[in-house]
Amino acid sequence: MNWAREVALRIIRERPNEEVYTVASGVSPSGYVHIGNFREIATPYLVAEELKRLGKKVRYILSFDEYDRFRKVPGNIDKSYEKYIGMPYTDLPSPYTENESYATYMENRFLNELKEMGIEVECIYQTKEYQSGRYNKYIKIAMDRRKEIFTIIDSFRTQDATIEEIENYYPISIYCPTCHKDSTKILSYDEKTGNVSYECTCGYSSILNISTATNIKLQWKVDWPMRWMVEQVTFETAGMDHSAANGSKAVSERVVKEIYNYNPPVFTPYNFIGIKGGGAKMSSSKGNVLTLTDLLKVYDKNIILWFYAKYDPMHAFDIALDNDVIRYYGEFDRYVKMYFNNTIDDKNRTIIEQTGVTKDYLNNPNFSYLATFLPIVNYNEDLLKELLEKENINCNTKEYAERLARAKYWVETYGKDYQVKLLEEKNIEVYDSLSPLEKSWLEKTKEILENTYQTSEELQKELYSVVKTKDLSEEELKSTQKRYFQILYNLLLGTSKGPKLGLFLLALDKDKVKELI
């Protein structure tokens, strides 16, 4: 049983009487949503899918925290955006498009990525929710019980609060209607009328009433639990930073129980995701991110979901862009074949089901073949197709075209070790260093290449026989064959290793090979 099934069963045990199980996630449009943020989406999505498989009615919601303040300018956004710090994301203009906000641009980009991943969500836009008045009565509750909330928050602090701090604590921010920033200070609050008197550093001052105000935002540790109650959330996840002993999760759980009279949702924290070969933790605000769009250029959507499905959320892992891409493609392909052949174990069966893979996936060619031979045939797709069809690979499917594009992108962008080409001239230095016996192997190879072979396996078998003699033990034969192949790779590619020789030689012009060896 994998982690998503275990979490789904735990939710049912702890909340057995729910008519609808509301699974929630939230994303800030502070910048491009990266593959680390995607764990915020993938974790509840996989749990929601398991709840459905267990026969439960599920509502999966994605909240865009777009009414949060713009805190700092991401590294990939123009520094002129510093003038917008303190405004809600929906009040900022898009840095790349006209007639839409910063928030809308980032949100739509991410929603398009989710669509490509096949993930459907019910979106909740927090600016709309706050400005519609939907939350006003809950804001009033928080303001009326602000000292109780302060006591809860203060219980998680190590330093004692002063009387002044308690008296001046308000669990809200107010966006100024003039400068649109949250640089406001509350001067007084009347519980009976719900009137709030405030002033802004820009010079504006006013009185608003909570029941009709459209520019109030609850602070995070009150906003989060309030939304749990409003949406009747039964499961949510968040990063390790929120899940610390004195973090926002612990505070919010008490606030939702004691202030809003709602049991907190079942919770699973998640750990960070890195990029293999990269050091720093990804950050939208810093601009150093790998987005789903970037990742989909390398990996099929099913493989991306597989990464998130197979690792427990608490398990930190790296997504590889180096040569391990080949290994992951091979591993996933094997599991899919085992799944459809009904030879897979129960745990991996569940994981493969969670990726949404269909039988059409079996139309995919071997990624390693594509990555290996694309540069060798100088990215000539017609020649590659001719070669692969000899191996009985169907090159006329949608899956083939998509995997070919990913293999080409990966080799050109990340697969430096695979960017090999046939040498233009004979490597005289290597050839002259060979013994007479080793040179005789090359002559036999030339003779073999005079024949016609239907498949690479036929040619591979002939190549293995070149160095085979009766007096060699099995171990000696393996060592000799390895030496023979290294010689061929050095003479053809200038390296000591390379692709499977049978298929490799079928891809090449025979006369050119004979010239080089």
Can you describe what each PLM-predicted range is?
Residues D68-Y84, Y138-I139, A280-M282:
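Charged, often glycine-rich, active-site loop that binds/positions anionic groups
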Residues Y81-M117:
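A glycine-rich helix N-cap at a beta->alpha junction
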Residues I119-L292:
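Active-site cores that bind ATP or allylic diphosphates and position pyrophosphate for catalysis
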Residues A48-G55, L114-V121, R146-I153, S183, ...:
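A generic secondary-structure signal for well-formed alpha-helical elements
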Residues H34, A142, S252, D300, ...:
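Residue-level signal for inorganic ion chemistry
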